[in-house]
UniProtKB/Swiss-Prot annotation:
Subcellular location: Cytoplasm
Swiss-Prot/TrEMBL cofactor(s): Mg(2+)
Name of the protein in its database record: Phosphopantetheine adenylyltransferase
Site (described: Transition state stabilizer): H18
A GO molecular function held by the record: ATP binding
Highest taxon in the source lineage: Bacteria
Database matches in HAMAP family: PPAT_bact
Residues reported to bind substrate: S10, K42, M74, R88
Stored NCBIfam families: coaD_prev_kdtB, cyt_tran_rel
Record field: catalytic activity: (R)-4'-phosphopantetheine + ATP + H(+) = 3'-dephospho-CoA + diphosphate
Length: 164
């Protein structure tokens, strides 16, 4: 049986918390599609193509991981791909409320849709891509919060190395 799930997100940038969820997802599913959301209402630091490349480099050559992107509703993307399962990471109880509402809306739009929630490890429960961006933009050190290739990309994008 080929069990697959979609792990959607903006991944702007990819964090070690995201990587931890990918690893947990691979323990639950045979295949994982990491789907980068293209949201025209946001002003991302990295383009969709840059984010996809950073994710590919960070996950290495694992054949169980596919990196893709989508526009619009994630549930429509899931329907198009024929993968009605989504993997979501939870950092705190506050994440659950939003994710619970989203899961129920997705289920309403696509009845066969299932959401699978996994907790982020204790090392990364406080890490969000938004906080990483803010800290990096102000010259703070985000080493250990993002993969090495993402740290280098942040430094290039911002034109300076982070403070120690």
């Amino acid at each position: 049986m080929n069990r697959a799930a979609i792990y959607p997100g903006s991944f702007d940038p990819l964090t070690n918390g995201h990587l931890a969820i990918i690893q947990r997802g691979l323990n639950l599913f045979d295949r994982l599609v990491v789907a980068v959301a293209n949201n025209p209402q946001k002003s991302p630091m990295f383009t969709v193509d840059e984010r996809k490349a950073l994710i590919r480099e960070a996950v290495g050559n694992d054949p169980r991981v596919e990196v893709d992107s989508f526009d619009g509703l994630m549930v429509d993307y899931a329907r198009t791909r024929g993968i009605p399962k989504v993997l979501r990471g939870l950092r705190a109880v506050s994440d659950f409320e939003y994710e619970f509402q989203l899961a129920n809306m997705n289920k309403k739009l696509l009845p066969e849709f299932e959401s699978v929630f996994v907790m982020t490890g204790e090392d990364y429960f406080f890490v969000s891509a938004r906080l990483v961006r803010e800290v990096a933009q102000f010259g703070g050190n985000v080493e250990g919060l993002v993969p090495a290739n993402v740290l280098e990309a942040l430094q290039r994008k911002l034109g300076r190395p982070p403070r120690s």
